[in-house]
């Protein structure tokens, strides 16, 4: 895959997760993604920004009989970390991302399926038995944990679901240590030989930092970013030119925001994706964005597009937004 990075035209440069529809089964141990050879994804039109994710699909039933399919749309994993910024659009534990969908123009009531994993083991039942909410990022969840009897807290510690609170002045407190995995499910009927359109939208949950960490060569994550986001030297150099103190790599007037889109689940349908179109919007001309792709073109002041035919979504999309701070 060709690497490339997109910068801000204002700085003189020429041209840095959520998921695909998939079929599913619900079995012992939770949601399982299944292969479907009877329905093909003809096209996918995906729009990614810091404010909104939109995706429109066209599906074709390749058979002469109606296909009844359980569709799943996996959302990004949610963790609770005191060391990284993570922005969640709402405090609604049942619809954190404000997800909505239509099937052939009609609204769909999707069912949310959630599981809590600690040390790779599904611990949903243990948490629910104790009345602990599954959303690890909410303060109400932490309050519920620390209201439990010590014996119950110790049970959760023993199975890896709780960790010590990271701040010294909170000695004796615990924080969630599990990962919440979520997917929206609904039953769909694909009419024999016909094409239907499916549309989703939601507000992404973004991770991030308070600085452009990749500029710091001693403690930064340059190598990781080069692999994950295809970060290139011209973007790094542009950010370095904005340093208010040349010897202080954290003095650049930028923050980071990270977006993950689960694209690989789209490989569960018959054949490849006929036409895949990706649009990434960096939000402001003063921002930068970096990610991996091929044949990208600039389509507007802040938008960039990639179009691929017979596309196989073997890996997910990782986007790095380098955001100019408003106070500079």
What are the language-model segments listed below?
Residues 14-16:
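N-terminal signal peptide c-region/cleavage motif recognized by signal peptidases
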Residues 18-328:
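Lumenal/extracellular ectodomains and adaptor appendage modules
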Residues 2-8:
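Sec-dependent signal peptide recognition
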């Amino acid at each position: 895959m060709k690497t490339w990075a997109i910068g801000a035209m204002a700085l003189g440069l020429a041209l840095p997760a959520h998921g695909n529809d998939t079929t599913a089964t619900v079995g012992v141990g939770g949601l399982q993604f299944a292969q479907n050879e009877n329905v093909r994804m003809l096209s996918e039109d995906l729009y990614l920004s810091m404010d909104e994710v939109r995706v429109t699909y066209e599906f074709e039933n390749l058979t002469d009989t109606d296909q009844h399919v359980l569709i799943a749309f996996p959302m990004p994993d949610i963790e609770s970390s005191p060391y990284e910024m993570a922005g969640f659009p709402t405090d609604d534990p049942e619809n954190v991302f404000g997800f909505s969908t239509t099937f052939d123009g009609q609204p769909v009531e999707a069912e949310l399926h959630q599981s809590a994993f600690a040390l790779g083991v599904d611990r949903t039942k243990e948490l629910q038995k104790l009345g602990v909410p599954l959303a690890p990022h909410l303060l109400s969840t932490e309050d519920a944990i620390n209201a439990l009897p010590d014996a119950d807290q110790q049970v959760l510690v023993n199975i890896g679901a709780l960790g010590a609170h990271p701040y010294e002045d909170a000695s004796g407190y615990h924080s969630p240590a599990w990962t919440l995995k979520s997917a929206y499910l609904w039953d769909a009927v694909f009419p024999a030989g016909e094409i239907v359109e499916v549309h989703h939208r939601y507000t992404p949950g973004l991770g991030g930092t308070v600085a452009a960490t990749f500029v710091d060569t001693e403690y930064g994550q340059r190598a990781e970013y080069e692999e994950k986001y295809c970060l290139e030297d011209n973007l790094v150099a542009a950010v370095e030119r904005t340093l208010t103190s040349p010897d202080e790599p954290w003095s650049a007037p930028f923050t980071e925001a990270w977006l993950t889109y689960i694209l690989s689940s789209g490989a569960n349908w018959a054949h490849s994706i006929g036409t895949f179109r990706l649009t990434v919007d960096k939000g402001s001309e003063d921002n930068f964005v970096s990610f991996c792709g091929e044949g990208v073109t600039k389509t507007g002041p802040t938008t960039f597009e990639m179009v691929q035919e017979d596309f196989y979504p073997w890996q997910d999309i990782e986007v790095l937004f380098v955001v100019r701070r408003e106070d500079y």
